[in-house]
Amino acid sequence: MNTWFLNVVDPLHQWFLGFGDIGVVLWTVLKILMIAIPLIVSVAFYVVWERKLIGWMHVRHGPMYVGMGLFQAFADVFKLLFKEVLYPSKAHKAIFVIAPLLTLAPSFAAWAVVPFDTKLVLSNANVGLLYLLAMTSLGVYGIILAGWASNSKYAFLGAMRSAAQVVSYEIAMGFALVGVMIAAGSLNLSQIVMAQAGSSGFFDWFLIPLFPLFIVYWVSGVAETNRSPFDVVEGESEIVAGHMVEYSGSVFALFFLAEYANMILVSFLISIFFLGGWLSPIQGWVSGQVSPLIDWVWNGGWPWLLFKVLFFASAYIWFRASFPRYRYDQIMRLGWKVFIPLTIVWIAVTALMVFSGVIQKGV
C-alpha cells in the first residue's frame, strides 16, 4: 500500500543527501513537518468530530455554521490566536509562558518513533518503547509549572492533582507495556507490529492473550490525558479549569493542542501494541494480488491503522458523553489497588505463555 509513497520519497531523500550535512538537516526538518502539520490538522478535525458526535448523542445538531461546521475548529484557533494573552499580576511570567510549550513539546516529540506502515516511520529506533515512556511522562512537568507560575490556588490544586494522577497511572501503563515487550521480544514499535503478523488474522494480535493489559493501557491512557471520566485535573464544578484557569489566547491554545494530540497518540499506540497496527484482521485468510487499491484489505496497510485509531479516538468522545466524573479518591484507588496488581500478575502470565509457546511471535 505504501509502495507508491516510497517511490516518491526515496528519490527525494537521495536528492537531499546530495547536499551533504545541510541536506541531512533539511531532510530531517521536512520529515518532522510531514508529521507535525497533518497532526495539527487532525486535531482541528478531531475537535469538529467530537462536537458533532456529542451533539448526535445529545440529540442535537452540533456545529452547523462556518463551512457547515467543518471549519469551526479553525475559526476557534484564529479567535484564540488574536486574543490578548493576559498575565496574572503576581504570576511568574517567564515560566507562565514556557509551561504550555513544555506540555506541547513531548506530545509532538513522541511521534518520532510511531510507525504508520512498513518503513513509514520518522525514526525506526530499537528503543522506541522506552523513548515513548519517557516522552509521555514529561508533559506533566509543564502542567505543574503552569499551576505554580499562575500563583492561583485553583491552578495549583489542579496541577497537584495532575501530578498524582499521571504518576499513578504511568506505573500501570509501564507495566502493561512490559507485557507487550515480553510478548514481542522487542522495544522497536515496527517489530512489535510484525510480531503480531500471522496466517490467523486478528487471532494473532496481542489483544487476545494480553486482554487485561489492553484494558489497563486503554483506561490508563484516558487517565493520562486527563479526559472524562478522569478529568478531575480541570473539574469545572470544583476548580474551574484547573491549571489552565489563568490562561487565555494563544498560550491556552497550546494546552488545548497538546491534550488532543495526546489523545490521538494514545489511540495510535493502543492500535500498534494490541491490534496489530497496520495489519489486516483477515491477513492470511485471503491471498492474491488484484489491485493496489484493494489489496490492503487483506494484506494490511496504513488505512487499517487509521480505522483502528478512529475507533479509539471516538471512544474518548463516547466516554465523555456517557460517564460521570470519578471522585479523586476513586481514581487513585483504581490505579494503585486494581491496575498495578493486575498488571504485575499478568506480566507473569505473559511470560508463562511465551515460554510455553501459547504466544508465538510473527507466526
Swiss-Prot record:
PROSITE patterns: COMPLEX1_ND1_2
Coiled coil: none
Gene: nuoH
UniProt lineage: Bacteria, Pseudomonadati, Pseudomonadota, Gammaproteobacteria, Lysobacterales
Protein name: NADH-quinone oxidoreductase subunit H
The protein's Enzyme Commission number: 7.1.1.-
Family the UniProt entry places it in: Belongs to the complex I subunit 1 family.
EC top class, as a word: translocase
Organism for this UniProt entry: Xylella fastidiosa (strain 9a5c)
HAMAP family documented for this protein: NDH1_NuoH
Catalytic activity: a quinone + NADH + 5 H(+)(in) = a quinol + NAD(+) + 4 H(+)(out)
Parts of the chain that traverse the membrane: 62-82, 94-114, 127-147, 166-186, 202-222, 239-257, 264-286, 293-313, 339-359
Origin superkingdom: Bacteria
